[in-house]
Design a protein with these regions (language model features):
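N-terminal acidic leader/helix
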Residues: 2-35
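Short, charge-rich amphipathic interface segments used for partner binding and complex assembly
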Residues: 33-74
Length: 74
C-alpha cells in the first residue's frame, strides 16, 4: 500500500514537471514577443536586456524541470 502511494506521488510529480516545463514555454513565447516589441517598436534596450535574461532563466528552469522528470521516470 505504501509503495503504491509513493509510486503515485512520483508519477504525479513527473507529470507536474512536464506541465510546468510546457507552461514555461508558453510564457517564454510571450516574453520573446514583447522583447521584440521593446526592441523594434519602443527602443528600450535596457528592457530588452532584462527580458533576454528572463528568457535565459526560463530556459534554464525548463531544463531543470525536464531533468527532474527524466530522473523520476527511471
Amino acid at each position: 500500500m505504501l509503495i503504491k502511494m509513493v509510486e503515485k506521488q512520483i508519477l504525479k510529480l513527473s507529470k507536474l514537471c512536464e506541465h510546468w516545463a510546457a507552461h514555461n514555454n508558453s510564457h517564454k513565447e510571450s516574453y520573446v514577443k514583447w522583447r521584440d516589441v521593446a526592441r523594434e517598436v519602443l527602443n528600450l534596450p535596457t528592457v530588452v536586456e532584462k527580458l533576454n535574461k528572463a528568457i535565459e532563466m526560463m530556459d534554464k528552469s525548463t531544463e531543470y524541470l525536464l531533468s527532474a522528470k527524466k530522473e523520476l521516470d527511471l
